[in-house]
Structures are given as C-alpha cells and as structure tokens.
Amino acid sequence: MRRASRVSPLLPGLVGLLVLGACSRPVAPAPARVLGAHADADSPRVVGAALVRDGDSRKELRRRHPRVEPDAALTATLASILADSGQRLRWSAAPVEDLACDNGDVRFRIQVRVPPACTERACPVLAFYTTGCPRPGYHWRPEFFLRAGFIYAEPAVRGTQCSEDWARADDGPLRVAAATDLEAASRCLRQRFTREGVVPRLGILGWSYGGNQTLVGMTRFAGSYDAGFALAAKTDLASFLSQTTPELRRARATEYGDPERDAERLRAISPMTWVDRVEGPIALMLGARDPKVSLSDADAFVRKLRDRGQDASLMIVPEHAHLTERPEEIAFEHAHLLQFFTSRFGVPLRVDCHGPG
C-alpha cells in the first residue's frame, strides 16, 4: 500500500496555503457559553498558575515559548462557524459510522464523521481523544475539521466515560495495557480509510486527558500517528506530581499512581520516558493560568525533541487556564490546530462554509 507523501517539517510555511474567508452569511456573535462548556470553567480548581520547577523562571519560559497569533481570516471563519451554532452549517449532524476496533480480546468503538468530499477519496484523518463518550449529533468541534476536509474520529478507548466500568478500565496499574488501544485505533483507522492503496495521513489531538493520550500516542507508540497536537497536557507525570499540591496529588493517586509507591508505573505511562522514539511533528499548547500543567516539564520535553532534530513546538498562552471554552479561545486554538495539521500533511487549508448544512 502507498502512503500519502510526507512533508518536510522545515517547510510548514510553504504548504497548507490559506484559501478561505469569513463564512458567506453574517451571523450573530457566538454566545458566551458554547455547546458542551463546563459549568466550573472559572473555578479555582482549574484556574490559577501553571507549575514551574524550583529554579525555573516563569517569565523566561513564557519568553521562550510566546503566544503566536493564528491567521486572522481563519480565526474569523471559525468564529463564524461557532456563532452559527448549527443553524445552517451542520455537516457534523449527519449520521455517524460506528467502527468496531479490536485490540486482542478488547473491542471498542470509534465514532467517525466523514465530510461529503471524502466519501470516496483518500482524506487525512484526525483522531480526537477525550474522557467523554462519543455522541452523534451537531457539535462545533467536528464541524470545524469536517469543513476543512478532515475525517473526524473519536475512539472510545478504555478510560472514556461510556460506562462506569469502562471509565475505570485504565486506572492505576491498568493504564499501561489500556494505552495499547491508542495503537489499535490507529491501525483500524488506517485500514478503514485506505483508498485505492493510499494510506491516509493520521493525526492525533486532545485536551487535558486527551492531550496526555496524544503525547503517549506520539511517543510510546511512535509511528502510529503522523503528527500530534496536545493541549493542557502533562509530559512527565512523576515530575508533575512532585510539583503540584498535596490535594491534587492525592486526587490523582487512583488514576495515575502514588509518586513514591508507584514510581515505575508513573515512568511507564509518562510521555517523557518514550521521547526518544518520536518520529513525527508534535505541538503543545499550555495556558499560563492552568494549575494542572507544568511549564518546566513541557519545556524539557520540547527541548529534548529539538535536540534530536524533531519538529516540536510549545506555546504558552498567558490568558488561558485549564478549560478554554470562551468563543475567542476556541477560535484561537482551533485555528492553530488547522494550520498545524494542514501544513504537516501538505494539504491546502480551505474551510468550506458554502452549500447546505
């Protein structure tokens, strides 16, 4: 089988040329609270200051990895799609495909949405990881990616909240084995969407828990995904737990492990442990007001990748906390996501706002 051609990581500015404008029909501004927003997005639990190791300078880390503005036209287009709220632009509301994926004796499903132009031809695929159980129906996030020409997949791997037992299926000592679902999902998606011998490019992305999954997919299972973008993610769990508060350390003991008692397990499930395996480009975006991430750990992770000549970037956004759900935050982040994946996959950046929803 042939795989779609690779793009040099040194040429991100020369590919994925922007071909778009604001959506053709004016719409009202997006509501202050968007579909799916958390009620506690502004609580002290998720808003504060990102962690830094003793001796590191928060100011220097922000200077080294500054906020960069995405393309203004793209951001405006995404804001228009968000404000439309599915009134006119509703590709994501079309019937979904539930793809069964086997990983040994474990079977999980992958919910897939396919844009109209990709029903017969090879298109890039994005796997979005989250704790939530995938659901059909309109949502602005898949709408963004579908209209940019991506097949959008949501693997319900062990740990997603599709049932109480399934949500706990990657807790503690189960996580090392459960993470192999990431590799299995990549195999299933490539097999399903190979067209006439052309294997699709496959990206991985997610926030928080999904961001951690993204980094594990790009490190421990290097080669399974062609590019990854992780937001609000942890790169080194043992280091993070040593920096955070005792309360959060206790709260995460069941999910990750205890730093003293389970040091080997934490090492095994940390992306930093497997960083030397990385083959594809990785981007990280963290908020300077996010108490659930370590800027120092992310900086060390990216520097190690760059020392190996890898395409790796980190952006620290001063205004962002852990949950970025305001319309302007959503448009900013997703503009960067689209620019990243189109440039690394060598496809034009076109966002289709025309025709029936």
Regions found by a protein language model. Name each.
Residues G21-A22:
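C-terminal motif of bacterial Sec signal peptides marking the signal peptidase cleavage site
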Residues P44-P116, G137-R147, Q191:
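Non-catalytic accessory segments flanking enzyme active sites
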Residues E97, T119-T194, V199-R201, W207, ...:
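Cap/lid segment of the alpha/beta-hydrolase catalytic domain
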Residues R187-T194, V198-S242:
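Primarily recognizes the serine-hydrolase "nucleophile elbow" in alpha/beta-hydrolase
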Residues D226-A227, A233-W274, G280:
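Mobile cap/lid helix-loop segments that gate and shape the active-site cleft of serine hydrolases
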Residues V278, L284-L286:
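Short beta-strand/loop motif that positions the catalytic acidic residue
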Residues R289-V293:
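Acidic catalytic loop of the alpha/beta-hydrolase fold
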Residues D299, R306-G357:
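C-terminal catalytic histidine-bearing segment of alpha/beta-hydrolase fold enzymes
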